[in-house]
Amino acid sequence: MSQDQQQQQQFNANNLAGNVQNINLNAPAYDPAVQSYIPNTAQAFVPSAQPYIPGQQEQQFGQYGQQQQNYNQGGYNNYNNRGGYSNNRGGYNNSNRGGYSNYNSYNTNSNQGGYSNYNNNYANNSYNNNNNYNNNYNQGYNNYNSQPQGQDQQQETGSGQMSLEDYQKQQKESLNKLNTKPKKVLKLNLNSSTVKAPIVTKKKEEEPVNQESKTEEPAKEEIKNQEPAEAENKVEEESKVEAPTAAKPVSESEFPASTPKTEAKASKEVAAAAAALKKEVSQAKKESNVTNADALVKEQEEQIDASIVNDMFGGKDHMSIIFMGHVDAGKSTMGGNLLFLTGAVDKRTVEKYEREAKDAGRQGWYLSWIMDTNKEERNDGKTIEVGKSYFETDKRRYTILDAPGHKLYISEMIGGASQADVGVLVISSRKGEYEAGFERGGQSREHAILAKTQGVNKLVVVINKMDDPTVNWSKERYEECTTKLAMYLKGVGYQKGDVLFMPVSGYTGAGLKERVSQKDAPWYNGPSLLEYLDSMPLAVRKINDPFMLPISSKMKDLGTVIEGKIESGHVKKGQNLLVMPNKTQVEVTTIYNETEAEADSAFCGEQVRLRLRGIEEEDLSAGYVLSSINHPVKTVTRFEAQIAIVELKSILSTGFSCVMHVHTAIEEVTFTQLLHNLQKGTNRRSKKAPAFAKQGMKIIAVLETTEPVCIESYDDYPQLGRFTLRDQGQTIAIGKVTKLL
């Protein structure tokens, strides 16, 4: 055979081998000129591949619809397309350069492409959203990140041909790798309730940084792996978590699991995400702390130290005392004499009143005219409105509240008692007058009950008119009066240590400022009235609590002026407050203290007058409450209360209506439900609701008012949570608010 024939035969053999190679799927032709695109090239190294071009990854998904259109034209099942539809290799027509005639053979050897490994990794690599695409792409798309091992190795051999021995060796190595235990893949399951992973929302500023890191990854791998034989297959897990209520994805992380380095990198990414989240939380806490700190500083600036208040008034605290008792018991006379003895009224003024009273035929009433400034009160000799006067001693500042004793003006007495700290119950020892005031229907008994109900827990019982010729400082008469009173006051609720009895003479002043002379009453060695009041302990003043002032009266004097006692907190000139229940915001323009002088501030326990801006006088009413804006007083129409029935001729049942007096407010109230009956002695609640209530019973009931009323729970603010019920001109029950409904 000639040399030319041998060359021709060798050429034909080579040509035949090339044709077989093109037809056989086991060794498809490799064309270096065609760029091989492999998804996520950071995990699959191809020596002959061109450097990764940014934006090509978006083409992987952006041309999905176009690739699906070519699927029917080529008649080629896409799930066998060399590891997934993403491996386009420049287009569908170019990816099958060997033709379609051996399509079945191609499918039978598809294990070379790594589809057996697909079944092993399916559980871990499932995309979970593959139903959004055509079912024909379920397998290929879920495993698009698993580059077939056989194809990588074939491409690594370059453009040369592969012998049968090399193919068998390659297939054996592929099977051995497929049979090995898959490496653990680092997973981040954000939907699991048992795995606590940081959920980080990617900021827009961070996205370009992440893309650059992914773009630089192939170059790093190419530098590291210079020899094709050292290339390793990398398996990545991409987890996309989309919150159902969020407008943007919560997290998107890639975790390669081929080497410890990639695992460490993933751990660093998680740690970085956790650090970012921790930084955001700490920043939020810091801002919150700054806000809270500013609010705290502002609140501390508004708070007043009690020592500062004492220094403002020379260390003297304030006390409001109310003179109460039956009509003609001598209340106004005693109050006027106290003002004269303490220097609040000068001698010249008293002499003037004495001359005027003598001319009017009321010679013995001149001291009462100091308190009764109204002409009608002076003519009739009885107090109609609650008179207010101010005096000082060496230890304290006092406001006298002179309550009317007549039963027609009991409402005014209740309003005055609600503003008092200490009660002075004036009892006339003159024969006939004591019996009229203390027996049934007398105002001495009712005033004692009303004082207790309105929070007057300290009571001084002064037996007045001991200088009267019918008494003449008699010890027997004094003991007769005090014995009956002590038993009655104990039944009302006063403890033994809360009540003090003393004999006085309001007209002569004996026992008011100085002690009773031993010549007149050798049997009494107790203190005088002012001596006892100066030494009496007072309740703690809550000057830094929310401001509350029940309005007792109103007037128009160059604006709207209201008057009342500050029950809680303090007020400053220029401060904004809220009038409840009409929720009107007002500004305090002027503050007048007890001496009618202007002041910059006023504190809990003081009787003040405030000029307000922002509201008209006709929009106010007695019983409204001036409170702080941040903590306004509660306004309700229904509430639950504990009620003790003191005097009731008939029975009380659901639907019963009466008049309620609470602080300075007067409202009509109706019993809507009787809940429990309280057992005597233990106050244990009955399981069955009572059908009615009568005198002497204690019950829990639900009351409803016709108009909104400003009240608080008795446990929170006792001065705004106690009330009195009156019907047909008499007090029938007392109570306290237990729950607001």
From Swiss-Prot:
Q: What is this protein called?
A: Eukaryotic peptide chain release factor GTP-binding subunit
The region called G2 is annotated at 381-385
Charged: annotated segments: 162-311
Where are the compositionally biased (Low complexity) regions?
59-161
Q: Which portions of the sequence form the region G4?
A: 464-467
Q: Which stretches make up the tr-type G domain?
A: 316-541
Q: What biological function has been recorded for the protein in this entry?
A: Involved in translation termination. Stimulates the activity of ERF1. Binds guanine nucleotides.
Chain spans, region G5: 505-507
Q: What PANTHER family does the record tag this protein with?
A: TRANSLATION FACTOR (PTHR23115)
- Biased composition of type Basic and acidic residues is found at 166-175, 202-241
Positions of the UniProt region annotated as Several sort of repeats: 5-135
Give the region (G3) as residue ranges.
402-405
The coiled-coil regions, if any, are none
Q: Which residues bind GTP?
A: 325-332, 402-406, 464-467
Q: Which GO terms describe its cellular component?
A: cytoplasm
Q: For this protein, what is any one GO molecular function term?
A: GTP binding
The record's SUPFAM superfamilies line, in alphabetical order, gives: EF-Tu/eEF-1alpha/eIF2-gamma C-terminal domain (SSF50465), P-loop containing nucleoside triphosphate hydrolases (SSF52540), Translation proteins (SSF50447)
Gene3D superfamilies attached to this UniProt entry: P-loop containing nucleotide triphosphate hydrolases, Translation factors
Alphabetic keyword roster:
Cytoplasm, GTP-binding, Nucleotide-binding, Phosphoprotein, Protein biosynthesis, Repeat
Q: Where is this region: Disordered?
A: 59-186, 199-264
* GO biological process terms on file: nuclear-transcribed mRNA catabolic process, deadenylation-dependent decay
Q: Which family does it belong to?
A: Belongs to the TRAFAC class translation factor GTPase superfamily. Classic translation factor GTPase family. ERF3 subfamily.
Chain positions with Phosphothreonine modification: 399
User: What is its subcellular localisation?
Assistant: Cytoplasm
What Pfam families does the annotation carry? GTP-eEF1A_C, GTP_EFTU, GTP_EFTU_D2
Chain positions covered by the region annotation G1:
325-332
